[in-house]
Amino acid sequence: MLDYAAFPEQRQALIYQILQENGRVICSELANRLGVSEHTIRRDLHELSKDGVCKKVYGGAVIALPESEDIAVRKGINVAKKSNIAQRCARLVKSGSCIFIDTGSTNLAMAEALPAELALTVVTNSPEIAAVLLKKPLFEVIMLGGAVQRSSGGCVGASAIAQVQDILFDQGFIGGCAMSPESGLTGFDYADCEFKKAVIKQCNETIVALTAEKIPAVARYVVTESSNIDVIVVEDNISKKYATAFQAHDIRIYTV
């Protein structure tokens, strides 16, 4: 059996493999498995985090996702998965409500899936989503203004934040790059994450739609902690372990 205490490169390679398989690692478990101290494991995780492989959390680490592509690129990725998730999100919306739809390819698919016979007030910061919603004659559509960010395809600056603070939403459908029970919902763009924070404060119910590879994972900036999310809509191959961990934060999990 390999003496992992004497071979840090092999040890870190195994940790990386475990991260890829499980999405997260726990220091105490790794220390027991590899026959080294927790201090050594924390040092390994520090090195891996510097390489962008993982992000350290309390007691261990979670796998880090690559930087998010622009919205134009994301629309062509995981189309079928996002369509299924979007249709499940659309079924959560009740006629007569006021909802917010965030930017993102899954939320764009959700806007397309909303039944035209619903009477809704829909607020969005995405010009592309607003254009889809305007095709549905019973929808009152409110477009938040300001400069349009190329990466997200939405308005996320001070003007949009000021406008959203005057509206109360029955439901908010928030996009996210990554989520874990410990780190909550996270994203890669600071301005976009700050805008999402402002929206969530105005929502009676906050709903996050994610493909399974984004759980568990951590991006650079925190949007909100897990306890502030009410619903996660995700593929049915989400790990039972993480579904249970999210439910411990009183989050309802809807799978497709």
Listing of model-derived features with the role each one plays in the protein:
Residues T121-V122, Q171:
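A residue-level structural signature of the nucleotidyltransferase/glycosyltransferase Rossmann-like core
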Residues L65-P66, M110, Q163, P181:
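Residues at secondary-structure transition points
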Residues L2-T103, A111-A119, L134-F139:
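HTH-adjacent hinge/linker in prokaryotic transcriptional regulators
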Residues N107:
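Conserved SAM/SAH-binding loop
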Residues L2-A13, Q17, E21-L30, G35, ...:
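Conserved phosphate- and dinucleotide-binding cores of soluble alpha/beta proteins
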